[in-house]
């Protein structure tokens, strides 16, 4: 709607000199209409040398050339944008960015020569990122759905999760989820967990959407040992989240939602292995209180713009994570390697259990057949692989399935099963035996394999081992 309103204003401004000229010549001066129209059109081309008979014609004579010049500039700019877009489209990795706000400029700057500034019209590109207000993104996608049918589209949405998309090339994303994934990747808890014998306490001050994503992602990637106990303590809301995600209670790592204020539990806040202060109202004041009340030397702060203008940003005890800026990093938003790993897992399963040939074409075909839940399950498995690689590096072992000791492979397979169970628990699945003899019932959300690794059949254990082998083979 806004696009058509802007276009209408431009047309009205362009026609303003014509209207003034017609009023001055045809109405006030009484000249024939066709003659008046001809002379008015000439004004746009600087072809009016007579003395204006009245003020209307005088205004038209001066504004018509300005209108012509402005449209020439606009046409040149549009032509330049289209030509640049086509030139960048010749690159196999071109990405068009549409939307509003600082995220557009941030993405285009990081994309460099492969970035295409979308503007109002649909320009050719190999992939598309839609940022800004969700309603406008959805409207733009619906308007161009036919042209985008075979293009990967990343659409920013606050209310819709990736599970809401039935189209394999349409991915809903939120900045908070991207930031959470990147934070746990960069923070790397494995070494800390080893030093603490895998007994950790993580405290979150503040919650909201960012806290939800940090917790969900952390429970799926911070898996280092079968007998670990990583506690997550939440201060600052979470009642709705706790009530909806009933499956969290089935996860071995405790999640505690505190109703009392954080400053009544200074012992826990001071001694926690990791303290995350999420962006919230009056965050600088909270940080001042925190630094005064505790002797902590390390605090991870998810900072927005308000903190950047305070001296607190320079405090060595605060590890600033500019989450809004990092959330739009192309590598984390597009992440080709993550998707390649997820598709490789799915294709291997299709080959082993469906006799599907492992070809590049079948990789895409089989991926497109997946329901959103299974698709995201494979992505979760691929995402955890980064932790697995860090563990192997710390143990001094090669990231090779052929060179992996059997005992290590078994450990990694058990950890993978724990992650798989957690993914299902976080979506409120429970153990159960479907009546038709199958392993799972998606409607009732029950699965026969939601049991400890030791209780699995050898065939089911082999699936977890094969998952490790597949991912270690993907570069």
Q: In which residue ranges do the predicted regions lie?
A:
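Cytosolic regulatory regions of ion transport systems
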Residues: 1-35, 42, 46-414
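Membrane-interacting alpha-helical segments
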Residues: 337-345, 425-427, 431-434
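Short loop/beta submotifs within extracellular cysteine-rich repeat domains
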Residues: 374, 388-389, 420-428, 458-462
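Short, solvent-exposed interaction modules
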Residues: 406, 411, 415-430
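Surface-exposed intrinsically disordered loops and tails
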Residues: 431-448
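Amphipathic alpha-helical binding modules
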Residues: 443-474
